[in-house]
Regions:
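Conserved Radical SAM active-site core
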Residues: 1-91, 259-264
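Conserved radical SAM core fold
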Residues: 12-13, 48-50, 76-82, 92-110, ...
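Short, solvent-exposed loop/turn segments at secondary-structure boundaries
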Residues: 17-19, 105-108, 142, 172-177
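Alpha-helical scaffolding segments of alpha/beta enzyme cores, especially the outer helices
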Residues: 28-31, 53-64, 80, 84-87, ...
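Conserved glycine-rich "GG(E/T)P / GGGxP" loop and the immediately following alpha-helix
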Residues: 33-61, 100-118, 127, 133-152
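Short, well-ordered coil/turn segments that N-cap beta-strands
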Residues: 37-39, 65-67, 88-90, 125-129, ...
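Hydrophobic faces of well-ordered beta-strands that scaffold small-molecule active sites
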Residues: 41, 69-71, 92-94, 129-131, ...
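Auxiliary Fe-S-binding modules of radical SAM enzymes
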Residues: 144-264
Length: 264
């Protein structure tokens, strides 16, 4: 897979001799994580299936120490690799860039979307799954609507991250996506996928989790200037919206990092 717009091309396409590699055994990575107070280890840039055996060893070592494991993946896997990856992970984020063979072939070079759709369907049934869709110009309401319906048919509670992509690599001269147009499209699509998020721009307002019934902010996040977000408010009461008592499908437990960082 060779994404035309890869925002990590400066790493992924960099000649090996120019990269200051650091060789770490799984035990060392886990030791570093524990000393840093980390509760999870995530492959967020590296595609885990490129070095799946190493990833599986790291995941097994981490789980022995009570550390959660997750990854971001393109989802282009064999059934065997998919099953092993899901067994090793507590959570997955799969990138769904389009929903036709033609678009995927144009954007990435692969000729069939079937393995990716299969990965999403299977992963949603065995572990916590979230999906990210990069958006670039020209923005298509039809394309986003099709992806939204596909996800909703599998499980309408799957979190969907719509990423305003700032193209690099072969499309580095492409214009940045229109924020207002994307927001207008997502306004209606949230009726199908209530846990839809939109970010990667300064002042992003679409990063918080809203109660699908009353619209109350139950988990508040702010934009950090990049594609990330910082959690600043956790308003759930026993996993439910404090306003209308609706159960919110959150996986895992809330950790108050601010108090941990202050030593309390």
């Amino acid at each position: 897979m060779d994404c035309k717009y890869c925002s990590n091309a400066y790493i992924a396409k960099c000649p090996v001799e120019e990269v200051p590699l650091m060789h770490l055994f799984p035990e060392k990575v886990v030791t570093i994580a524990k000393k840093s107070g980390c509760q999870s280890i995530v492959f967020a840039i590296n595609e885990p299936t490129v070095s799946l055996p190493s990833f599986l060893k790291l995941a097994a070592t981490a789980k022995k120490e009570g550390i959660l494991v997750g990854c971001l993946t393109n989802g282009y896997l064999t059934n065997t690799s998919l099953q092993k990856l899901c067994e090793a992970c507590d959570f997955l984020n799969i990138s769904l860039k389009a929903l036709t063979d033609e678009e995927y072939a144009d954007l990435t070079g692969i000729t069939s979307i079937s393995p990716i759709c299969n990965s999403i369907t299977y992963a949603s049934s065995v572990c916590h799954l979230e999906i990210t869709t990069p958006v670039l110009e020209p923005i298509s309401s039809e394309k986003l609507g099709k992806i939204c319906r596909f996800i909703a048919q599998i499980n309408p509670e799957i979190p969907w991250h719509v990423l305003r992509l700032l193209p690099e690599y072969m499309l580095k001269d492409a214009p940045p996506p229109d924020i207002q147009k994307i927001e207008q499209i997502l306004h209606d699509l949230r009726k199908m996928l209530p846990y839809t998020y939109f970010g990667n721009y300064v002042g992003a307002q679409g990063l918080s989790t809203l109660c699908p019934v009353c619209g109350n902010i139950v988990i508040e996040r702010i934009n950090t200037g990049t594609c990330g977000g910082r959690l600043i408010g956790y308003n759930l009461s026993n996993g439910k919206c404090p306003h209308c008592n609706t159960k919110i499908p959150i996986t895992g437990n809330y950790v108050d990092w601010e108090h941990l960082e202050n030593g309390s």
